């Protein structure tokens, strides 16, 4: 009847509960959008909000042929309940930064939600270098060593992010993450737009996934990831939507 039976899509990077910000402040670059618009709103969200906002996203995913997502957000208890109630598979990822969550909570969540429900699992992660101080990143690297686990974060999404990291540490975010031991057991870098050849060699060395979000990068005019070069180098790739806002 003209139908196609195939495996479902998997959304490799998203912030599902950000359905609250859809079509909100669409004309701003990333940093202004985050700090001036999104972060102040996120500070007001409750666990109940996250449940309903996530469940809306999960139902939209299912309608679009997406059966699982890799979800970086807050209130994992609410995210997990929304996933189970919707019959949707979710891999939750830590979103630690300077003003939300902590390495201690990340440790707790890792143990709790990897033994919670067959549809739910949890990975170590933090938001990004520019929102997370060195001591927090070092503590997360220690957790990666403790659990022999991969670590995931936003990386090299914009040119200003990379230049800011070079100004703070004298190296790119990718080089910093390697120096700290965050990728000793692999992981993933969300966006990976402004990456150098040296950065890509680090990805290849540690088996780090470049998790691409072309639609989000186009909307924010962040740039275009060097996908052809990544493919030529044999770097593992995955594709995500980024947040629905």
Walk through the language-model features, giving the residues of each.
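Active-site-adjacent C-terminal substructures of enzyme catalytic domains
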Residues: 132, 182-245
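Metal-coordinating catalytic core of metallo-dependent amide/deamination hydrolases
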Residues: 78-196
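Hydrophobic residues within beta-strands of alpha/beta enzymes
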Residues: 69-70, 151, 210, 238
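Active-site metal-binding loops of divalent metal-dependent hydrolases
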Residues: 14, 72, 79, 155, ...
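Histidine-rich, glycine-flanked metal-binding segment
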Residues: 1-6
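Alpha-helical scaffold segments that flank or form the walls of functional sites
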Residues: 22-87, 107-116
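Histidine-centered catalytic micro-motifs
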Residues: 7-19, 150-159
